[in-house]
Amino acid sequence: MIKISPSILACDFARMGEEIAKVDKFSDYLHVDVMDGLFVPNISFGMPVIKSIRKTTDIFFDVHLMIERPERYIEEFAALGSDLITIHYESTENPAEVLKQIRALGKKAGISVKPGTDYSVLLPLLPLCDLVLVMTVEPGFGGQKFMHDMMPKVSALREDVKAGGYDI
């Protein structure tokens, strides 16, 4: 199943409301990259921005947390209207517990891996996931060149998801 989820990281920040309105009718999700400058070398949006844009649209919010120790903020991001919260495997000591925390709040849970991380670390987590994101760029900046050598990882993971009968 294909879902369209444009990233607001690519929008004109001075016209964020207008930019969101342009894609709202034609998109399934709105992808919101949250970066803390620690887990990745860039800073993007925080909770106040999500709170503000949530008031402008009822589109499904796909919030991608590229932050250290995301478990500290899951409740707040859920309360602000995130529908799906994706964490990075590498960002926390216990990704399974964070995924359970997200689901316990009634939200969909996603897991992501950086290009250098072996996808097999995700296999025990698949029963806890609604989405798996294999990064095909180094996280932290938009507009990077696609890493074609990540496609075998995507294909292998797809086969494992299918073989396990997971609805991801």
Question: Where does each model-flagged region fall?
Answer:
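Carboxylate-rich, divalent-cation-coordinating active-site regions
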Residues: 132
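Predominantly soluble domains enriched in secretory-pathway, periplasmic, or organellar proteins
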Residues: 99-101, 117
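Conserved Lys-Pro-Asp/Glu-containing loop-to-beta segment of HAD-superfamily phosphomonoesterases
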Residues: 167-168
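A short, flexible beta-alpha/helix-coil linker loop
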Residues: 36-37, 137-141
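Conserved N-terminal beta1-alpha1 strand-loop-helix module at the mouth
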Residues: 1-86, 92-94, 101-104, 108-109, ...
